[in-house]
From Swiss-Prot:
This is UPF0053 protein bbp_300. Keywords: CBS domain, Cell membrane, Membrane, Repeat, Transmembrane, Transmembrane helix. InterPro entries: CBS_dom_sf, FAD-bd_PCMH-like_sf, FAD-bd_PCMH_sub2, Integral_membrane_TerC, Ion_transp-like_CBS, Transptr-assoc_dom. One of its GO terms (molecular function) is flavin adenine dinucleotide binding. It comes from Buchnera aphidicola subsp. Baizongia pistaciae (strain Bp). The chain crosses the membrane at residues 13-35, 48-70, 80-102, 123-145, 150-172, 185-207, 212-231. GO terms for cellular component: plasma membrane. Residues 311-373, 374-434 form the CBS domain. Its main location: membrane. It is found in: Cell membrane. Belongs to the UPF0053 family.
């Protein structure tokens, strides 16, 4: 009892507890790695049982202190080498650490490892417990030797070991959660295990490496890993502020398109030689076709598009003027490959109904009043500010009819059919009286001025033509905004990495443009 009244005893006890905890941190890390091989419901139990057994083993080693002191005497000796009991323990312990670290690193670095929990094969419970006890026994050697060198009092040493082990038991669960959330820490710790194993083997063979070098290397690596974790955390924080839809779309596009996709917003480069090698090893049936990439990109970017980029523009609408002669209306219906027509009074903004060409031809043959006939099917009108997702619901309610798009003043801007939405996703389907909007020639593209910018971006594999603050949706709108006025034929406009040469233009619009890439 008088022993605990001595202040030096309390100072020694506190010092020894701190040393035991510091020397046991590495043990906790590897206990967490081992327990991860068990089902989640058994991990806590394995840690508690394993560390409890390890506690009794440490107490047993302390009780046999007098015998441990004699471990420095030679047991095996000849003219080539000599080993003491301590050397043999260090040798076999170091070899065990090297073997265990190599196996664990191989599993962590193997790309074929199954991450699916349903297919994951867990290790046996007692197998992991035994490994925890063995691992703790190896790591406890330095702690036991430290205890012997610090205080030459067995009860104080046992109290310090018990307190340190209880604190380690409490800290084992949160430390395990941290390691499971940060897998790079696991690889780092396994690398430490290799270093420690090599050091134990070299020390057993008589090659003494100053512990300061080992601790300096471990400390420096930990600092670098802390920087990596901070950078990772800041990256995830910045990513969380971006719209989830945009992040999901970019992740899928990077997966499908690989090196061809570049996110200019976050300046993340996806050029990766390893990915290219992996992609080259896949067969043609496994890789994504260009059409599949185009459609996936169209689906993911549909919500970000404007109605103006999807609709058929006003100048391309085929409509019926009821004030025209019947024979001219009949010729128009027969010559135009459309099945639905807006019927208007003199101008497109005066829509009275949407009719089918076949039904209107029958009405003309039977001399039915066209105004009364067309008024039975009223047009569905939507504003040009409607988003594409809500547009899908409108098209479903239209039941195959077309939808008229107007601006805030009621002027018709265009029309939309289900085919227009399909073209926004899968690409252009030209009618019989149309030519493709984009025609590829040698090292250049011939593009109509009214071509949608989203389709053009996908075709040219670029991402810098569309800006959210701009209202234009066509190539002509982009070039006029870039020039500040309507460009003339023969003029060239440069928007890196592209060069736009105006081939055909009138006083009112751009008809045809040749696009080349800058060299």
């Amino acid at each position: 009892m008088e022993l605990f009244l001595d202040p030096s005893t309390w100072a020694g006890l506190l010092t020894l507890i701190i040393l035991e905890i510091v020397l046991g941190i590495d043990n906790l890390v590897f206990v967490a790695i081992l327990s991860e091989k068990l089902p989640p419901c058994k991990q806590d139990k394995a840690r508690l049982i394993g560390l409890s057994f390890a506690l009794f083993m440490r107490l047993g080693l302390l009780a046999l202190m007098s015998w441990m002191v004699t471990l420095t005497s030679e047991i095996i000796s000849n003219k080539y080498f000599s080993f003491s009991g301590r050397d043999l323990i260090l040798l076999f312990g170091g070899l065990f650490l090297l073997f265990k670290a190599t196996i664990e690193l191989h599993e962590r670095l193997d790309n074929d490892i199954q991450k699916n929990e349903n297919n994951k094969h867990y290790a046996g419970f007692w197998t992991i417990v035994i490994q925890i006890v063995i691992l703790d026994s190896i790591f406890s050697l330095d702690a036991i030797i430290t205890a012997v060198g610090t205080i030459n009092n067995l009860p104080i040493m046992m109290i310090a070991v018990v307190i340190a082990m209880v604190l380690m038991l409490i800290a084992s669960k949160p430390l395990t959660k941290f390691i499971n959330l940060h897998q790079t820490v696991v690889v780092l710790c396994l690398s430490f295990l290799l270093m420690i194993g090599c050091n134990l083997v070299s020390e057993a063979l008589g090659f003494y490496v100053p512990k300061g070098y080992l601790y300096a290397a471990i400390g420096f690596s930990i600092i670098i890993e802390i920087f990596n974790q901070i950078a990772r955390r800041n990256f995830m924080l910045h990513q969380s502020r971006r719209p989830m839809r945009q992040r999901a779309a970019e992740a899928i596009l990077r997966l499908m398109i690989g090196d061809q996709f570049r996110n200019t917003t976050t300046n993340i480069s996806t050029k990766n030689k390893d990915k290219e090698k992996i992609r080259n090893r896949t067969t043609d049936t496994e890789s994504f076709k260009e059409e599949e990439r185009y459609m996936i990109n169209g689906v993911l970017t549909l919500a970000a598009r404007s109605i103006r980029s999807i609709m058929t523009p006003r100048n391309e609408i085929s409509w019926v003027n009821i004030y025209q002669p019947k024979n001219k209306i009949r010729s128009q219906l027969l010559d135009t490959p459309h099945s639905l027509f807006p019927v208007c009074k003199g101008q497109l903004d005066e829509v009275i109904g949407i009719v089918r060409a076949k039904e209107l031809l029958v009405a003309l043959e039977r001399t039915i009043n066209i105004i009364d006939f067309s008024s039975t099917t009223l047009p569905i009108i939507i504003p040009d500010t409607l988003d594409p997702i809500n547009l899908l619901g409108v098209l479903r309610r239209a039941k195959g009819s077309l939808v008229i798009v107007t601006n805030e003043f009621g002027a018709v801007q265009g029309l939309i059919t289900p085919l227009d939405v399909l073209e926004a996703i899968a690409g252009e389907f030209p009618d019989a009286d149309e030519t493709p909007d984009i025609i590829f020639e040698k090292d250049s593209w011939l593009v109509k001025g009214g071509t949608d910018l989203h389709s053009l971006q996908q075709c040219l594999n670029i991402t810098n033509l569309i800006k959210q603050e701009n209202s234009y949706a066509s190539l002509a709108g982009l070039l006029i905004a870039q020039k500040g006025q309507l460009p003339l034929p023969g003029e060239t406009i440069v928007i890196p990495p592209l060069r736009f040469y105006i081939l055909e233009a009138t006083q009112y619009r751009i008809n045809l443009v040749r696009i080349t890439k800058q060299h």
